[in-house]
Amino acid sequence: MKILEIIPQLSSGGGERFVVDLCNELSKEHDVTLMVLHSLDKVDFYLKEVSNNVRVVSMNKRMGLDIGLLFRVYRYIRREKPDVVHTHLRAIMYISFAIMRKNGVMYCHTVHSAADKEAGGSFISSGMRKFCFHRQIGRPSGRERV
């Protein structure tokens, strides 16, 4: 199975630690790519702990809301054709365009903090998270997602 894990950055947080551990374990039996939205030049706290079996891709997100990143992430998903796209933290807002064009990909999102903290932000980012929520991306649906 091809799995794409997406996280904003590899800073020293608990969500980041979880994603690195998850990628390392999944890579024992699956083809795993870890997409980091921000540049690895700035924050790479956990990069050395990512298994050599995990492909790491940096999308070099610009400061603030990077609209172009929506399309770069979509093109990457379309080109690589993962079976599962799993977002973490605030990365969910950058897969909204890809979700609209599903193409047989299973999307899921993990909330790593209090939901109200993660749901904050600008009108655009909170709107994108609501869009994903209404399409059952990142909320329980009564059946296992991955």
Question: Where are the regions that the model predicts?
Answer:
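Membrane-interface segments of envelope glycosyltransferases acting on lipid-linked substrates or membrane lipids
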Residues: M1-R143
